[in-house]
Amino acid sequence: MTASAPTTTLGNNHGKEVILVVDDEASIRRILETRLSMIGYQVVTACDGIEALELFKTTQPDLVVLDVMMPKLDGYGVCQELRKESDVPIVMLTALGDVADRITGLELGADDYVVKPFSPKELEARIRCVLRRVEKESIAGSPNSGVITVGDLRIDTNKRQVYQGDERIRLTGMEFSLLELLVSRSGEPFSRGEILKDVWGYTPERHVDTRVVDVHISRLRSKLEDDPANPELILTARGTGYLFQRIVDAVASEGT
């Protein structure tokens, strides 16, 4: 396949959110560029993984739409490379019925997925939902925000950051939103359905693999727990879902 020059509308739409669309199918790139531009986003496109990483460095997009199967470097490889340096939201495009694609992408740090063939409206809805989470970060800092400390774990809901001792633990926007939800009702379980609705904005009408939640819980545990196989913070509620340990010795303080 002959690589096409990257397409960008950056020069004409300053101040708008930038989306990097990565797919080796030219027709999909054209459709998404047109649709996303029409609803107000700046769009940059890449036809393979190598081009995507190069464009990411120069454009610093607000969100990446990333196909799995691509030449040179596949979507998994791109996701891994991006997660080494960035928490940018990533929405994966996966093959119809291929559960392994979805789970692998989430395990590598993707925030969400859309199954091919997909409706552009569905992808637009997923993008809006994920970006709303990011927007929440940018407007954080209200007088009601604060810091919750559990042992040596410090959760700053003002800056949407987590520290273990003096070390900052890097979380994606979705991971922090999931943690924030669990902490908001510590000691009480959330069902997977509740989590999908509150964190990802999924409705019951959309049949989503609940392993989306399981994978993100696993990633959170790997980052926050001393022994992820025997968690003490994020617990499994048998037959229900998950809960954060009851905060009885936590210290809550106002953000500064």
Where are the regions a protein language model picked out?
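Active-site beta3 strand of CheY-like receiver
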Residues: 59-65
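Receiver (REC) domain active-site loop signature in two-component systems and cognate sites
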Residues: 70
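Acidic catalytic/metal-coordinating carboxylates
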Residues: 48-51, 74-77
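A structural micro-motif at secondary-structure boundaries
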Residues: 148-176, 189, 206, 243-256
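Basic, amphipathic DNA-recognition helix from helix-turn-helix-like DNA-binding domains
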Residues: 24, 80, 84, 89-149
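Conserved acidic segment of CheY-like receiver
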Residues: 15-27, 32-36, 64
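Short hydrophobic/Thr-rich beta-strand motif most characteristic of the beta2 strand and flanking loop
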Residues: 40-47, 55
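DNA-binding patch around the recognition helix
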Residues: 145, 170, 215-217, 221-256
